[in-house]
Amino acid sequence: MERKLPFKWEHDEFREAFGAFLDKEAVPYYDEWCKNHMVPHEYFEKMGQAGFMALWVDKKYGGAGRNGDFLYTVIKAEEYSKRGLNCIFSRLSGDVVAPYIAENGTEEQREKWLPRIVKGETVLGVCMTEPDHGSDLANIQASAVDMGDHFLVNGTKTFISNGM
């Protein structure tokens, strides 16, 4: 059974623009990035300058304000996949981790971090996989102790996605 998503002309324009961006800013460098196991920070900044980071973020924080329209995220995933760009985790920063700040952060934290994420200045990562527990967050062994003005984090990780 074929399923069709309800794309509109705005989505088609976005797809064309994002695909052209990838062809210029990612495809020519992708093999080198994979070899080095790192996507350079400049790529995220270019994504931000082009308006492709964290599209859901409210306009008051510098975002496009496309909250609730998940089809833009679908298009980004399809365009990355279409080009075989499987080790670029830009969606992790803007679409997976940043919503935690938007939903659970204070207004001060939103004002500080969301504009930087939208611009690609700040890249968020995830480090949850541990040697003896995999990605089972219920059994995570890492600890974080509130030291007053900072947290002391102690633990061993196997992977850090978007670690730079």
Where are these regions (language model features)?
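N-terminal capping segment at the start of a domain
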Residues: 22-31
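Internal helix-loop-helix
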Residues: 49-111, 115-120, 161-163
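Residue-level signal for inorganic ion chemistry
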Residues: 11, 22, 106, 155
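Glycine-rich, Trp-frequent "lid" loop and neighboring beta-strands that shape
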Residues: 62-66, 108-164
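Active-site-proximal, well-structured secondary-structure segments within enzyme catalytic domains
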Residues: 35
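His/Cys-centered metal/cofactor-coordination and adjacent catalytic loops
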Residues: 39-40
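N-terminal glycine-rich anion-binding loops that anchor highly charged ligand groups
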Residues: 16-21, 45-50
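Intrinsic disorder at enzyme termini
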Residues: 1-13
